[in-house]
């Protein structure tokens, strides 16, 4: 068999970065970038092996955040500012997992889009 060809991950030496947490009702995605916006590491609940309704749990968000933080710390990341977006269940647990992984959080910003009476919302579920 031929050896697997692909890009080798280049070790960057980055001290500060931005963590983008996108938390929807169905999944939680964590993207870690440098201050200019170039992606260093990313993870999501689905990428960590959770399927279906388990992706939307706080534990899945915690696992995804820990994984993304570990990947980013390989590049020398130490301090981060956090940008949280969305109404999902994994917002707070992802933040706790980032600080537990050893990243120093300097700023937390909530950029959840709020409509000023925009589109009509989806109808209520009747179970």
UniProtKB/Swiss-Prot annotation:
Tell me which InterPro entries the record gives.
Answer: Ribosomal_uS11, Ribosomal_uS11_bac-type, Ribosomal_uS11_CS, Ribosomal_uS11_sf
Q: Name one GO molecular function term.
A: structural constituent of ribosome
Does the record's keyword annotation contain Calcium?
no
Lineage top rank: taxon = Bacteria
Q: Does the keyword Ribosomal protein apply?
A: yes
Its Gene Ontology cellular component terms are: ribonucleoprotein complex; ribosome
Q: What SUPFAM superfamilies does the annotation carry?
A: Translational machinery components
A Pfam family that the UniProt record links to this protein: Ribosomal_S11
Q: Which Gene Ontology BP annotations are present?
A: translation
What are the entry keywords?
A: Ribonucleoprotein, Ribosomal protein, RNA-binding, rRNA-binding
According to its UniProt entry, the function of this protein is described as: Located on the platform of the 30S subunit, it bridges several disparate RNA helices of the 16S rRNA. Forms part of the Shine-Dalgarno cleft in the 70S ribosome.
Question: What family, per the record?
Answer: Belongs to the universal ribosomal protein uS11 family.
Subunit structure of this chain's protein? Part of the 30S ribosomal subunit. Interacts with proteins S7 and S18. Binds to IF-3.
The name this protein goes by in its record? Small ribosomal subunit protein uS11
